[in-house]
Amino acid sequence: MTKLRVGLLFGGRSGEHEVSIKSARAIAKALSVDENASKYEILPFYIQKDGRWLAGEAPQKVLETGSPLLEAEQSTSEGNLTSNPQVQTLSKWESPSQVAQVDIWFPVLHGPNGEDGTIQGLLTLMQVPFVGSGVLGSAMGMDKIAMKMTFEQAGLAQVKYKAITRAQVWSNPCVFPKLCDEIEAALGYPAFVKPANLGSSVGIAKVRSRQELEAALDNAASYDRRLVVEAGVVAREVECAVLGNDQPQASVVGEISYDSDFYDYETKYTEDRADLLIPAPIPDAIARQIQDMALQAFAAVDAAGLARVDFFYVEATQEVLINEINTLPGFTATSMYPQLWAHSGVSFPELVDRLIQLALERYSPS
């Protein structure tokens, strides 16, 4: 049987570059075991932090070591940009020849330029199937403002929020105090200030005072031109995984327990800082409500293949509030998404196989 050549695309121009490598290593391992090994051939492609694509030995080395390439290694890697300085000024990257050999793409790129619709647009232009959401679903799942507006239209309950632009924060020192007044009046304290288009809690701050609010807005504006401020809520953080295309399934519900003030980047990716409770110790009726809302959110943003949907469970009032949808969640062996499916009866290798089959199904014109 002819093997399907899977283009495993990882790294990227993002603050989540290292997380992408971890996810890609886990997926490569899953593609190399048992039945998957007889069906799939892995063609790894590594996108450097400057945006250049590498194929051949370089990405294989990154997968083996789990570490980004050093600058000295990048300059001599196979598939790198031509050494002609005039060409370098014209194009930031050139496509390695191995791109033409790919039967299906498996992008494992987290954050901007990876799960925001940009790479999905490129893969769509290639007219080759790829795992995950398309341009629309990816873009909607990345931009927190567009996402929240969509959830609102879908009738999904969520925390109060206010959308802000960088111009409002930086343009006029006379306008900024009024903006802070409006935020305080609408949301109160504590509140969370977030860049609209970054993942893994990068640039997010919890604020409890005017001074902290001003500093957090200034910091978030350095990451993104679109910002969102959310009202704080005393709640448990629970998550549900979704798998499928037009008839998706929801996993069991899991809960995140952590020892920090909120689930920030350090807590997410530092060992033993957070515990995953699967299934979450919540009432069955609440779990079913979360699963239903996860499927509604998946459909609302036009997601495909996979997504992890995050919620707040306000135990005191029995309310469930949707927080966000992540259309390309972390995919290490210990990440919440594969763990939720493992507890739902789908092993990691089987999950990877099903995602590839879902991508082929979605691409098929029938």
From Swiss-Prot:
Molecular functions per Gene Ontology: ATP binding; D-alanine-D-alanine ligase activity; metal ion binding
Keyword Signal: no
Cofactor note: Binds 2 magnesium or manganese ions per subunit.
GO biological process: cell wall organization; peptidoglycan biosynthetic process; regulation of cell shape
UniProt subcellular location: Cytoplasm
Positions of Mg(2+) 2 binding: E324, N326
Pfam families xrefs: Dala_Dala_lig_C, Dala_Dala_lig_N
PROSITE patterns: ATP_GRASP, DALA_DALA_LIGASE_1, DALA_DALA_LIGASE_2
Recorded metabolic or biological pathway in which this protein acts: Cell wall biogenesis; peptidoglycan biosynthesis
Residues annotated to bind ATP: 184-239
EC number(s) on file: 6.3.2.4
Reactions catalysed, as given in the entry: 2 D-alanine + ATP = D-alanyl-D-alanine + ADP + phosphate + H(+)
Binding-site positions, Mg(2+) 1: D310, E324
Positions of the ATP-grasp domain: 148-357
Cofactor(s) essential for the protein: Mg(2+); Mn(2+)
Key words of the record: ATP-binding, Cell shape, Cell wall biogenesis/degradation, Cytoplasm, Ligase, Magnesium, Manganese, Metal-binding, Nucleotide-binding, Peptidoglycan synthesis
GO CC terms of this entry: cytosol
Domain of life of the native organism: Bacteria
Task performed by this protein: Cell wall formation.
Family membership: Belongs to the D-alanine--D-alanine ligase family.
Protein name per UniProt: D-alanine--D-alanine ligase
Lineage: Bacteria, Bacillati, Cyanobacteriota, Cyanophyceae, Nostocales
